[in-house]
Amino acid sequence: MPASAAPGWRVETGAVCGHAAGLPAASGPAEACADCLPIGGQWVHLRRCLSCDHVACCDSSPHRHATAHATATAHPVVASAEAREHWAWCYPDRALLLPSP
């Protein structure tokens, strides 16, 4: 898929992603991991699922809830839910996505 195929996201140069087309723009920063809150868990960084808007913690966090969510639901792409970060990651294609200009 060409890097310009996604209206909201472009695939980083040299990468291929079959999931970028039609993804919504990231909806901004989040405050907490929805999965850590009920168990009193700690998180390092937050990721937002672009399929269902679920907010979960990154792989540097003890519980790695974003990856667990992607695996359990087959939702392929998460975006950073951190302030001043504008990128997304496609799990199946291991591709970095950046906002389209």
Where are these regions (language model features)?
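Canonical RING-type zinc finger of E3 ubiquitin-protein ligases
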Residues: 41-51
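Structured catalytic/translocation cores of nucleotide/phosphate-coupled proteins
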Residues: 2, 52-54
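Extended, low-complexity, charged intrinsically disordered regions
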Residues: 1-7
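Cys/His-rich, Zn2+-coordinating zinc-finger modules
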Residues: 8-9, 13-21, 27-34, 39, ...
